[in-house]
UniProtKB/Swiss-Prot annotation:
EC number: 4.2.1.19
Domain of life: Bacteria
Name by which UniProt lists this protein: Imidazoleglycerol-phosphate dehydratase
InterPro entries: IGPD_sf, ImidazoleglycerolP_deHydtase, ImidazoleglycerP_deHydtase_CS, Ribosomal_Su5_D2-typ_SF
Places the protein is found: Cytoplasm
Cysteines engaged in disulfide bonds, as pairs: none
Catalytic activity: D-erythro-1-(imidazol-4-yl)glycerol 3-phosphate = 3-(imidazol-4-yl)-2-oxopropyl phosphate + H2O
GO-annotated biological processes: L-histidine biosynthetic process
Pathway note: Amino-acid biosynthesis; L-histidine biosynthesis; L-histidine from 5-phospho-alpha-D-ribose 1-diphosphate: step 6/9
One Pfam assignment: IGPD
GO MF annotations in UniProt: imidazoleglycerol-phosphate dehydratase activity
Family per similarity comment: Belongs to the imidazoleglycerol-phosphate dehydratase family.
GO cellular component: cytoplasm
Amino acid sequence: MRKAERVRKTNETDIELAFTIDGGGQADIKTDVPFMTHMLDLFTKHGQFDLSINAKGDVDIDDHHTTEDIGICLGQALLEALGDKKGIKRYGSAFVPMDEALAQVVIDLSNRPHLEMRADFPAAKVGTFDTELVHEFLWKLALEARMNLHVIVHYGTNTHHMIEAVFKALGRALDEATTIDPRVKGIPSTKGML
C-alpha cells in the first residue's frame, strides 16, 4: 500500500500527518485553521485518498505557519508514498466547477518542483483565512512532493467557491497522476528516471 506518515514539531507548529494514496476518500483532519480543514476534506474526498492530520500552530499570530507546514508535511508524505514512481500515469489534470467558478489543475510528478498559479481572488479573506495562503500551501506542497503544479482559476466571483474548486481539482488531478497504469512499464520517462 502506498502510504506515508510525517511528524513536524517546531516552535511554530506541531503536526502529525498520515497519507494513503490508494484510499477511499476518508478524512480525519483536525487543524487550528477551519477553512484549511474544510479544503483538505474536499481534497481528500475528491482524490479518493485517506488523510489524517492533527495540526496545532501559532494561529494567535496568523494562519501562515500552520498552513505552510501542512503543505510541507503533505508534500513529503506524498513523495515518500509514491516510492520509485514505477507504473504511475505521472500526469493528471482536472477542471472543476463550483457554481459560478471554474478551476483547472494540471500536475506532472516529474521531480521538477514548480508552481504556476493564475488566480485573482476578489476577497483578501474568507472568514479569518488569508486567501494569499492558498499559494503558500500549494507552493510548499509542490516543492516537497517535487511536482510541477499548474493552477488556473478561469473565472469566478465568490472567493470561497474559487478556492473550493481549486482543492477539488487538485484532488482529482493528483488521483489521476498517481494512478497505476498497467500499460506503463517501469519509470514513465524516456530518460529512464524522474
